[in-house]
Amino acid sequence: MGLTWRDPLYMDAGMEKKINRIRWRLEHGAGSFRLYLVTISTSPGMQLDIVSAADLKQRVIRRRLPMIVGVAGSYEDALDRVQDMLADALAATGTPDIRKYLENRQE
């Protein structure tokens, strides 16, 4: 089973040119130790998780990874992508419910 990606992804500036290669590497288990993925959280009461792409080397994490909504080159950049998502959710819905905003945009 492959990874689930949200389109369009939230990503760092300059990653647009590399995103197809990044996706291919992650889909085929090549991994990348310098990437962080922002995913929909599976934990009750939480909205998003930030996961190191290196963790995808573990089968259990790879199989259970929820939808990927963002890609970043560092943990700090991943936090910036979450802030971007929050700003978009607030502008579109007036509430800070990022998860609901992203799920509704996906449909």
Task: Annotate each PLM feature.
Residues 4, 8, 20, 60, ...:
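Generic, low-specificity signal for short hydrophobic/alpha-helical stretches with a mild N-terminal bias
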Residues 31-67:
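Short aromatic-glycine-(Arg/Gly/Cys) micro-motifs in beta-strand/loop hairpins
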Residues 24, 59-61, 103:
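Hydrophobic alpha-helical segments, principally membrane-spanning helices and signal/leader peptides
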Residues 1-26:
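Negatively charged, low-complexity tracts enriched in Asp/Glu with abundant Ser/Thr
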Residues 28-32, 74:
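Short acidic/polar alpha-helix capping motifs at helix-coil junctions
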Residues 63-106:
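Short, compact, well-ordered microdomains
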